[in-house]
């Protein structure tokens, strides 16, 4: 039987292992888009444990007979001008260990995270998933998510001859244009 519970500091190794696996999975799917660092487990585990004391975040684990077999990390977020969305709950990570996929752990993690988000006053939940991750997309659609955005990525070679200048603010002077330059 799989139960969902809040993560604890004692889960750090399992969280790190699954976070590292998630990073490798994304990088393998598109190494130009997703980063890969050597031995991400320790850092990922520390980061997720740091979220346990953040009142705007929740990290839940799927526990099967005392063994952590998956996790979800969600947060409460405000308005995002960058993403053109209102306040929402955001599911940053969800991962279930391969041997237990299909046994309901992912669905149970999602339901508990969504309940936590609702209890924190948000009426919308947002997440991203890889374009080619059909299993995850089917899980999300089955829980009631709908597709709203598609990320597009273009890889370009930087041009060494182009210097990017920051835009000036009103009333600011550029080099050679200020009172000290006259």
Task: Provide a role label for each language-model segment.
Residues 20-47:
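Conserved GNAT-fold acetyl-CoA-binding loop/helix
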Residues 46-60, 90:
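A short helix-loop-beta-strand connector motif used in the catalytic cores of GNAT acetyltransferases and
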Residues 61, 67-76, 90, 95:
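Conserved beta-strand in the GNAT
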Residues 100, 104-112:
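Conserved acetyl-CoA pyrophosphate-binding loop and the N-cap/start of the following alpha-helix
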Residues 107, 119, 131-149:
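Conserved active-site alpha-helix within GNAT-family acetyltransferase domains
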Residues 118-128:
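Conserved GNAT acetyl-CoA-binding A-motif
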């Amino acid at each position: 039987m799989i139960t969902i519970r809040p993560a604890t500091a004692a889960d750090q190794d399992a969280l790190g292992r699954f976070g590292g696996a998630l990073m490798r999975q994304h990088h393998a799917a598109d190494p130009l888009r997703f980063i890969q660092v050597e031995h991400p487990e320790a850092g990922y585990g520390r980061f997720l444990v740091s979220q346990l004391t953040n009142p705007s975040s929740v990290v839940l684990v799927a526990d099967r007979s005392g063994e952590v077999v998956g996790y979800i990390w969600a947060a409460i977020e405000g308005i995002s001008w960058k993403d053109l969305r209102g306040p929402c709950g955001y599911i940053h990570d969800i991962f279930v260990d391969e041997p237990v996929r299909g046994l309901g752990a992912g669905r149970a993690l999602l339901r508990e995270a969504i309940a936590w988000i609702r209890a924190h006053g948000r009426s919308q939940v947002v997440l991203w998933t890889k374009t080619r991750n059909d299993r995850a997309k089917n899980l999300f659609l089955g829980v009631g998510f709908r597709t709203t955005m598609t990320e597009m990525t273009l890889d370009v070679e930087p041009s060494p001859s182009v210097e990017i200048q920051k835009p000036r603010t009103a009333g600011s002077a550029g080099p050679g244009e200020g009172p000290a330059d006259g």
